[in-house]
């Protein structure tokens, strides 16, 4: 157990998966839509410490109807500074507005903002175009929020995996090798469903 595990988060059960993705994919760019207190951002940043990649955490840091209205910005910055996380860049902004000027290809896109159908759809439509062909998109809370699950079910043209623990994690990739690696490494550890392309 380390300092990251002291952060209360519904994402804690996905830590090993995030570390696996970074180790397997060697991503140059990870984008996280929704930082909150930073658990998943810190996990990715920590996993990147011996690599060249960067995680960009994007958030307004105002909270929302699901998390409650709260400002976590200073807490996130303090953890970045106190734990020397050099592989993370925080962008304070609206997801849609930031996407309008975004110009980097993305290896891992993590969608974990407002959990309404419209918001998740908007995040996907604005950001999935930047994901590289061998990349991956992950949606948190596909079990905890029906509207996230409904949108995830509607997305087509990707291999889908669906973890059921820790509020659920929906996974999209067009990379069959990565899909198979995930199945081989996690089928004995977690319950999940596999859907074809």
Region annotations inferred by a language model:
Residues 2-197:
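S-adenosylmethionine/decaboxylated-SAM
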